[in-house]
Regions:
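Extended, highly charged segments
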Residues: 1-317, 323, 327-328
Length: 328
């Protein structure tokens, strides 16, 4: 699953005590979408701007680096090596992280820069800003041909993405709970309605709301009695309180010995078919989940390549046989 906004908030809450004040010693770019900041104290901060797995976390996984660092990596080294982390912020419940850094240039001048991670699926990006909020460079440049409304190019002032027209449990709690009490139309599926009206909530959590209210993940509003509607409102209230109090639990879901999802709270919707396991930290949870996923994808890719090679050899053999002269 993509890292949803509440889970991202949980990760950042965990990271702050370890990262605030830490010094950046090295910058690496093991893959096109990955930047690793090596921090004083043997910490490795991974910032992934890949379409399928955008995230920020501390990682214990050692990744091979290319012999020649990419240009973006060299630029980050120039600006960030020696910098100290001043703050780590998330705008409301957006899938974004803003690292504010105190940097010293080659002339000894001190300034603040920001490294912005946008965890937005195929639009994920990593952007370096100067002290005035101008873009120094992006992992992916976005010009007018790619977006008519929001360009990301060196020299332009950086602007946050336009927020979705949805309610936030963090900054609009009262309105959020009032809307939950009204609910949707009788034929509307509860989980779909939750996704349409609230920001920061993933499909997994929307289904969990529906399940805990109506005992089914695809329950519709018309099937809920008054008690169940009250239970749905309570889910919103409990989640809002957990977010405000930063009360989270790293949870990873396994099915057939394979990780299928992760989140920040207990999950009941799958029953016995899925094992719900907790971990000591969100970074450990993310390392475990994505490392297993990458191994599965590598194994599947190798299997496809082996099948393709066998198919190619078989076709070649058939071609050779067809070209053999027939006996008189």
């Amino acid at each position: 699953m993509p890292l949803d906004a509440i889970c991202l908030r949980a990760v950042l809450h965990e990271l702050r005590p370890q990262l605030i004040g830490a010094r950046i010693d090295k910058v690496q770019q093991p893959a096109r979408d990955q930047i690793v900041l090596l921090l004083r104290g043997n910490l490795r901060l991974l910032l992934n701007a890949g379409a399928n797995q955008p995230r920020i976390q501390l990682t214990n996984i050692l990744r091979d680096n290319p012999a020649q660092p990419p240009m973006f990596c060299m630029l980050l080294r120039k600006h960030l090596v020696g910098a100290r982390v001043l703050s780590i912020e998330q705008p409301d419940l957006e899938r974004m992280v803003i690292l504010t850094l105190q940097c010293t240039d080659e002339f000894g001048e001190i300034s603040q820069k920001q490294l912005v991670l946008e965890c937005m699926g195929r639009r994920s990006n990593l952007v370096l800003l100067d002290a005035q909020g101008r873009i120094v460079e992006c992992l992916r440049r976005v010009d007018a041909d790619l977006s008519a409304t929001r360009q990301l190019l060196p020299g332009l002032f950086y602007h946050l993405p336009t927020p979705l027209d949805k309610l936030s449990l963090l900054s609009q709690e009262e309105d959020s709970l009032a809307l939950a009490q009204r609910g949707g139309d009788a034929e509307q599926a509860v989980d779909k309605w939750v996704l349409d009206h609230y920001t920061g909530i993933s499909p997994l959590i929307a289904r969990e709301f529906a399940f805990r209210a109506g005992r089914e993940t695809d329950v519709r509003f018309g099937a809920l009695n008054d008690t169940q509607r009250g239970a749905l409102v309570q889910e919103f209230s409990d989640t809002a309180n957990a977010v405000k109090e930063d009360n989270y639990m790293p949870v990873i879901l396994y099915r057939d010995s394979k990780p299928v999802d992760f989140t920040y709270r207990p999950i009941a919707q799958y029953g016995a078919e899925t094992q719900v396991e907790t971990r000591e930290s969100f970074s450990q949870m993310l390392d475990e989940f994505y490392d297993a996923r990458e191994r599965q994808e590598l194994s599947a890719r190798r299997g496809r390549e082996l099948t393709d090679r066998k198919s190619t050899r078989l076709n070649s053999s058939h071609t050779d046989i067809s070209r053999m002269p027939s006996s008189a």
